[in-house]
């Protein structure tokens, strides 16, 4: 009661507290000044929303104030309002009015695919699952803002609309809004920037920005288009303000732009920057800048085809435009930066994001061009995607493809010369320039075909060997088959009648003995009368086949007896001394073509003979198989006999299938020569082969049909394991053709005869892997799919590969892969050692830059690897350690073969990991064939051409200016000029006379100066040789003569500065020196003639160009002080004032030179020691000490002056 009394009296019921608002309602308000700070929440019911037409809907992640508070919400865009709630079935939806809204990406790299919806009173930050979904939402919101109809297919055409593509960013210097002209807020000038044209805006001003983004089509240019006699052209597209600090006006070459206000202009295409007052002085037509070769001008996009795709016309100025595909996910989202930079450099309509629609739209746009280039910015997977789309549109003959490495491995980019990685988007102009100078190479592309079929798995070799060794009875049975095969081979290949008859007799006895022994063995193992009857029928069939063969032989014998001469041989076969030839062929070996088309007339029934031989072989094989089956059934009841039967029946099939794939119809009766006779220890597999012939009867050994493409000789295959192959062929009885064909019989008979039944899984451009490397790649792909945030950078990806490789080093998942797969190269079975994987290489770069083949040059066994020779390299993967070591050391012991086709059979019931160019999957049991598909044109960086071109450009800078044309000066000389040229002609004649006189006694001078003297004499004869007309001398002939004599003077002085100065006598040296001095004096007088002054001596501009060229070749930026410049000028002035060449100086000229260096105190010393010009050029530090120059500063000044004289004087006079 007390408690009740103390309680307050009950009043009216209090309303329940309002529910807390959803997280989605407390979005961050716009913080910029002038924006309302109060957020009014509006809600709608699902019924109200249902009445409106939906534009787009889906789940997005909504951020509030931090990532920790981000929530998944369901968004619906209907009309000009955005609705969101927790789920699609929610009743209450929050709404955002989009009347004055703008949308922008949230960051520069935008790793989380976020975008911001900016309204006058709030800012809504949303994150999509991927970039494509984000761009879909941005495009839908833009169309709503623009009051346009949105269709889901329009997202890929967004850059044709002319609207700005905003993203939020900060700036390192004051930046101004292009809408309100005020500075962007904050110390970092945070605001919005258009990713294409760099239009700047406040977030509140973005909605008021005009749609004047960079032009893409002819319609977007509008009324500013220029029409002239050459057609239509594009004017400059100007954007005001926010110029870089180093901006200079293109017209007046003065600094422009400002950090205090929005002023001056920049062209979005040619990047020209001008003052507002100079803008009218610039040419109206835009030259499109340094990248004009790669740019598609907007005037070329002027129509749309029936499918809604833009069509590009082919203007004359656009011969090989560039189509750019960027994978925005590649390289830790570095692709987003490259995507924006390419849109700024080129036409945005020629830049496409592979994550937003793929390559189809871009290729459709460019397919009308006769030739165009493609640049794929991404990894090897992106390149394969683009090439596959090129296949579907059949554009291989029109386009050349280059690669900019943004992925993880980038193997193809390494091989093509574009490097292993590219992270700096500021280098794109230089990259585009290198792409224009690239050369073209063909890239082989290979189809990876698959046919799924369950194939029995082979057992361990050791177990098989033991089982075979325990049973001598089975070995004797198999011996009969070997004997039959050997004698059949002699009958088919021998042209000697006696050999054929003797082989036929032995064959008859062997078959009879074989039937008798089979009968005895069959009585021991079978008691059923039914099975006895079956065996009796098979033996009777065998007897019929033998009779048919003998009858055919008799017919042939009768035909051959009528001719006097023996027939020619059917085929040439390698004869081994011990009868154990090698199946493996050397480099130049080829399989002998089928003997059927070249059969002589006396062997008319030879086709029947082959058929009879094969039938006989089949019959024997059927009897043996039936015997084995009966033994299997009888002995399956006991444990000991079960092991014997398994060792007989299974191992024979497995070892057959391991080393001998089916022949199909691709091989004929012929074998290549053996390559090696080396004897090595036999593996368990080879021991088994040595005990049994592994021959199986099959129709596959029939001769090919005439005219069949598969009947052609096999291509050369180079195999590294000659010892293994020699062991195989040595185990076959007699080394005969039939025995070698029997080894190729298909024990399962399950492979389709043609590729029509195969399915193309993918196309290989780089490499194919099965086993260990594919397992690592598959694990990495699965981890990247589960945790994409852990695999966003190239460094992290390489670390993950290392971790997964170390894991496989311990687990050894595929340590017995040779028991799970069989390998054929060009139709030849390859016995495999113990390995964990097989790699098939098309390019010499594997798994991120490893040269897994182990070399780039040709050797005695293999040709040099190349990606344009239609040859694959096959290598073995022994383990993770080998893959790691091969990155440092070029290993070669794991090479298997070089071939043109590869076939891999997967045995058992379980699939095996397979990877192509880094994309991995688990391939079910069956067959995999790798065959050549086509070739693609690729752009390869040509460093040699770039170096040569750069040298040529430097040389062009150093060359003298071209002589002015006759139109720049009078056609005839005046009287004063004619008098001056007469004096010049006299000096020229003296110089030529002196050179010819000295050349009579010095053959070296004649050889060195003959060309220059002849050219000067001809030009002199042209001027003075004919009678002078009343009009005077022709100025063009005079100009040519002056130039020739300048060249002659330079070459003569250069010759005298070398060893020739020591060979001449003093009178000859003095005679030639005086002639050269007079020529120099006449050339300096020509400087008074305006149209000859440029030819007479280099001007200041040329000197500057020479200096720049020297500086650029040095590779360093050197600061030259004012004192050093003045000193160099003094040296040049001293040299020019003294007139004569340095090596002709006397003591007076040397003293004058010292006076120019302000070292008058040493004049007497140099004169007393008779230091002349030739000695001066060879003075060294110790010589100066001996002369009495003790001060270090004076010594350095003299040595630098001497160096300058010997280096710059000839260059200036040349």
UniProtKB/Swiss-Prot annotation:
Its EC number is 2.7.1.107. It comes from Homo sapiens (Human). The SAM domain mediates homooligomerization. The PH domain mediates association with membranes. This is Diacylglycerol kinase delta. One of its GO terms (cellular component) is nucleus. Residues 7-22 have a biased composition (Pro residues). Homooligomer. Monomer. Interacts with AP2A2; regulates clathrin-dependent endocytosis. The gene is DGKD. Diacylglycerol kinase that converts diacylglycerol/DAG into phosphatidic acid/phosphatidate/PA and regulates the respective levels of these two bioactive lipids. Thereby, acts as a central switch between the signaling pathways activated by these second messengers with different cellular targets and opposite effects in numerous biological processes. By controlling the levels of diacylglycerol, regulates for instance the PKC and EGF receptor signaling pathways and plays a crucial role during development. May also regulate clathrin-dependent endocytosis. Residues 317-451 form the DAGKc domain. It catalyses: a 1,2-diacyl-sn-glycerol + ATP = a 1,2-diacyl-sn-glycero-3-phosphate + ADP + H(+); 1,2-di-(9Z-octadecenoyl)-sn-glycerol + ATP = 1,2-di-(9Z-octadecenoyl)-sn-glycero-3-phosphate + ADP + H(+); 1-octadecanoyl-2-(5Z,8Z,11Z,14Z-eicosatetraenoyl)-sn-glycerol + ATP = 1-octadecanoyl-2-(5Z,8Z,11Z,14Z-eicosatetraenoyl)-sn-glycero-3-phosphate + ADP + H(+). PROSITE patterns: DAGK, PH_DOMAIN, SAM_DOMAIN, ZF_DAG_PE_1, ZF_DAG_PE_2. One of its GO terms (biological process) is platelet activation. Residues 1-52 are annotated as: Regulates association with membranes. Pathway: Lipid metabolism; glycerolipid metabolism. CDD domains: C1_DGKdelta_rpt1, C1_DGKdelta_rpt2, PH_DGK_type2, SAM_DGK-delta. InterPro entries: ATP-NAD_kinase_N, C1-like_sf, C1_DGKdelta_rpt1, C1_DGKdelta_rpt2, DGK, DGK-delta_SAM, DGKD_4H, Diacylglycerol_kin_accessory. The keyword Transferase applies. Keywords: ATP-binding, Cell membrane, Coated pit, Cytoplasm, Endocytosis, Kinase, Lipid metabolism, Membrane, Metal-binding, Nucleotide-binding, Phosphoprotein, Protein transport, Repeat, Transferase, Transport, Zinc, Zinc-finger. A zinc finger (Phorbol-ester/DAG-type) spans 163-213, 235-286. Residues 53-146 form the PH domain. Belongs to the eukaryotic diacylglycerol kinase family. It is found in: Membrane, Clathrin-coated pit; Cytoplasm. Residues 1145-1208 form the SAM domain. GO terms for molecular function: ATP binding; ATP-dependent diacylglycerol kinase activity; diacylglycerol binding; identical protein binding; kinase binding; protein heterodimerization activity; protein homodimerization activity; zinc ion binding.
